[in-house]
């Protein structure tokens, strides 16, 4: 994997609060190698290590994108939902930003069936066929469509398992992480000071609560994906 320059600087990360961890009572001892200090009862993440792992993650997604790889971004915190959707759409990635439905990946055949149903209902709505049904039947199908849009809208074009998952909160998205471990799908994970870095294939030590921190990390990864996709077009 070729190393590239991704304009990752420590000052920018400090301004975004990437270095702020959780209180010292709420920590995972396995995070010790990534913790720089304890300030007023708060663990401070070592940003030099964050920068190194983030650069590695950018290299990884660039290479995968240049080969046509598919990415799934997972971040279901309410305050991050819009950010996740915008970033994923920009980089032509799939995303889950509401609730992770158990078995979404490990029971892919069921997910695929739901996606087919979702596409059929969207087609019926676009062609006006839903409005020609009896009101009761139309109302039931519209509710189904709304439900599917909420939970599967970000993966509606996904035709198979993704090549890499980008997980923005290890604790919040633990079910998704376990499914990836079961299936052997590589994961890039933001890990705060209360997380287990050993569960992620490529952990990025960072504040996973502050929107500025999440935005900075996600924007770097999305930029690398976009660059990788452009590279594949320039060098087919």
From Swiss-Prot:
CDD domains: RPS2. Keywords: Chloroplast, Plastid, Ribonucleoprotein, Ribosomal protein. Pfam families: Ribosomal_S2. Signal peptide: none annotated. InterPro entries: Ribosomal_uS2, Ribosomal_uS2_bac/mit/plastid, Ribosomal_uS2_CS, Ribosomal_uS2_flav_dom_sf. One of its GO terms (molecular function) is structural constituent of ribosome. Gene3D superfamilies: Glucose-6-phosphate isomerase like protein, domain 1, Helix hairpin bin. Belongs to the universal ribosomal protein uS2 family. This is Small ribosomal subunit protein uS2c. It comes from Oenothera biennis.
């Amino acid at each position: 994997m070729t190393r590239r320059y991704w304009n990752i600087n420590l000052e920018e990360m400090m301004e975004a609060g990437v270095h702020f961890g959780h209180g010292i009572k709420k920590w995972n001892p396995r995070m010790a190698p990534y913790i720089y200090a304890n300030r007023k009862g708060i663990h401070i993440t070592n940003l030099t290590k964050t920068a190194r792992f983030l650069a590695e993650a950018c290299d990884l997604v660039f290479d995968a994108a240049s080969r046509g790889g598919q990415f799934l971004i997972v971040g279901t915190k309410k305050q991050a939902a819009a950010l996740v959707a915008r970033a994923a759409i920009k980089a032509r990635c799939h995303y889950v930003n509401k609730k992770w439905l158990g078995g979404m990946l490990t029971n892919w055949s069921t997910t695929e069936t739901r996606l087919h149903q979702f596409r059929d209902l969207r087609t019926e709505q676009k062609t006006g066929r839903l409005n020609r049904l009896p009101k009761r039947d139309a109302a039931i199908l519209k509710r189904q469509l709304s439900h599917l849009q909420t939970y599967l809208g970000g993966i509606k074009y996904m035709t198979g398992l993704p090549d890499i998952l980008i997980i923005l909160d290890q604790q919040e998205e633990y079910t998704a992480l376990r499914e990836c471990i079961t299936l052997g799908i590589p994961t890039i994970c933001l890990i705060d000071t209360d997380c287990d870095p050993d569960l992620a294939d490529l952990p990025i030590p960072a504040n996973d609560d502050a929107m500025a921190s999440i935005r900075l990390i996600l924007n770097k990864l999305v930029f690398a994906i976009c660059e990788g996709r452009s590279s594949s077009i320039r060098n087919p």
